[in-house]
């Protein structure tokens, strides 16, 4: 998927949480309806079969409950996308990334080949459709997640290049696939955040650690030999550069990928480097933008949402701008675009008991014109307003209401944007208050069953809050757009 990812280490966050967040975007020319659900252990089969690649994989016999953000319309696979399991391990997958012909020629992608004549079909590898479903129900730590996915990649291969994030309450790991069967993973420094557009991102990798203590680096068992055999190390100074070895540096990256990383870094570290002008240290076309940085201030969920909603506001590249050269507006691919299906931010809060730690923040449709809502993840069901999405447009669905608000507000941006700003502020403030209230109620309750019931009650209250505010905002932006119709006429009989 054409996505954008932001990871926040525990010492870089405002409250010591690990946070992983990703915009899940549809490809150009279509939209994918999504829903927020809980998948129970009994819903997992003994053998998984991919819809797209037809690969069959036996599953362990002890799956855990997990949340997921699957496709609302069946037929093309599950695409679970993001979630938290009962062990408080979070995962988001995948960020589609890039590679180069040297890698893809040395370790080709494992692509499904349909039957032809007397030749039987050849199953493909695993991909975004499958990865969360194959990994999340069976893992107890972020590191264990990397190890499980790594074994699956080595065994079955993949038909696409992907980046995947894993977290527990203590740490975050980021894994990138390399060709059909290889991979590398790096632990996110606790004091840093990571920005990821659709491009291989890891900018430094310690092979000695990966094949030694494995404190901060893990990789496929033969990666060192693979690099040497196919002459992938391009460094002149003896310091291995994984981007040069495994990644891409194309003209399209400078329009589609590097500008997004530039804006995220520029927002969270505005004075660390010079980001604009002829003397800029980094520009939207820079290939050496850092994979991770220590932020200038602690990062909140609201900061994450702002960054993942970017349309280059405050720069000449904002498609909504009324200033600057017209030819610069919209020249780069925005982070908050029309094709955002959802954003999921998974927050694991270390200062609370285990059953309260996991909060999953969810928003649907274009991030530039929506609102994000927190929900407890350690629950048995999710509210119908988020879980009941279908392929039919409905105001009873948070997904569809969000799509309508975004489309109408975009078409009447000058008059509607302040309605959306008030909507987002109101939702975040009210839902923060509800979360604080229900945290306190649970901390005062010693009965685990009662605490679980309070989480269910809280999620219904949060959904009711956003449903009312979304309906009010839809009414307002509909009025603004209707008032600006081309057949509008000022004279009336009333």
Predicted features and spans:
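A contiguous strand-loop segment
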Residues: 2-128, 148-281
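Short Pro/Gly-enriched beta-strand edge/turn motifs at strand-loop
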Residues: 61-65, 146, 322-330
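Short, well-ordered beta-strand elements within core beta-sheets of diverse protein domains
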Residues: 132-138
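Short, charged, surface-exposed loops that flank catalytic or proteolytic processing sites
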Residues: 138-144
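Short, well-structured alpha-helical segments that form the helix of a local strand-helix-strand
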Residues: 145-154, 304-308
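Glycine-rich, aromatic-lined ligand/substrate-binding cores of catalytic
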Residues: 225-351
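Substrate-recognition/cap regions that form aromatic- and gly/pro-loop-enriched pockets
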Residues: 313, 317-446
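Histidine-centered catalytic/metal-binding microenvironments
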Residues: 426-494
